[in-house]
Amino acid sequence: MEMLEEHRCFEGWQQRWRHDSSTLNCPMTFSIFLPPPRDHTPPPVLYWLSGLTCNDENFTTKAGAQRVAAELGIVLVMPDTSPRGEKVANDDGYDLGQGAGFYLNATQPPWATHYRMYDYLRDELPALVQSQFNVSDRCAISGHSMGGHGALIMALKNPGKYTSVSAFAPIVNPCSVPWGIKAFSRYLGEDKNAWLEWDSCALMYASNAQDAIPTLIDQGDNDQFLADQLQPAVLAEAARQKAWPMTLRIQPGYDHSYYFIASFIEDHLRFHAQYLLK
């Protein structure tokens, strides 16, 4: 591992690291915020997954999460949104390829060689964080848009791994919206049954009651993608039918930007702290 940057921040440290990923077959970067140590108890971790076109730095520089994370004693880990490099398959569109990994394991050429973000987030990155930093094994997950989709599927596919999950403007039903249909058809092929294991709504309908974890979703009602791409009401209906403990908050006037995230990230951190710090 190689440290690329380090900055003092709210008595903690904001760092950026590069490592060689055996899962993704390329070098990867991630950012991490280490809060000031409190006692001898290792702090819990909140993983943040960003959206289309982003990398590990968008949340770090725009969300303003460090102050509250420092106060609460929560480590923040921000991975990249896809594998990257000259040898990694790409596309001219902003919503496919590098910067648009959709947090799944691709099965189709040319994507399958590198695009295994699900395995990277489930296994390799948490193991790396555990081995290199003083953290506990208690973790939660959150994200925005494509990253909200990622956070939800990570939680739904791994019962018991996360204490809680939250999302800002997530893509909840990718099987049925243009972003998801484009990505899934390329990454996973035309068999739509294979798509269902990466769709939060399908996963929630298939979930067991004992696996439900506290879930918070914020959605701005002035989001230009709300009607065509996001459709959080579809997941809310699944949660209702499954009695899943989910709160969906529609925030008047807010759009899809990091101004929206910055406005409510404190709520999300305090939401996760209730369960991470038990």
Curated annotation (Swiss-Prot):
One family name in Pfam for this protein: Esterase
Gene Ontology biological process terms from the UniProt entry: formaldehyde catabolic process
Name of the top EC class for this enzyme: hydrolase
This protein's UniProt keywords: Hydrolase, Serine esterase
Active-site residues (renumbered): S145 (charge relay system), D223 (charge relay system), H256 (charge relay system)
Enzymatic reactions: S-formylglutathione + H2O = formate + glutathione + H(+)
EC number of this enzyme: 3.1.2.12
An example Gene Ontology CC term for this record: cytosol
Molecular function in Gene Ontology: carboxylic ester hydrolase activity; S-formylglutathione hydrolase activity
Hydrolase is among the record's keywords: yes
InterPro entries on file: AB_hydrolase_fold, Esterase-like, S-formylglutathione_hydrol
Chain's role: Serine hydrolase involved in the detoxification of formaldehyde. Hydrolyzes S-formylglutathione to glutathione and formate.
PANTHER family: S-FORMYLGLUTATHIONE HYDROLASE, S-FORMYLGLUTATHIONE HYDROLASE YEIG
Family from the record: Belongs to the esterase D family.
Record's protein name: S-formylglutathione hydrolase YeiG
Source organism per UniProt: Escherichia coli O157:H7
Gene that specifies this protein: yeiG
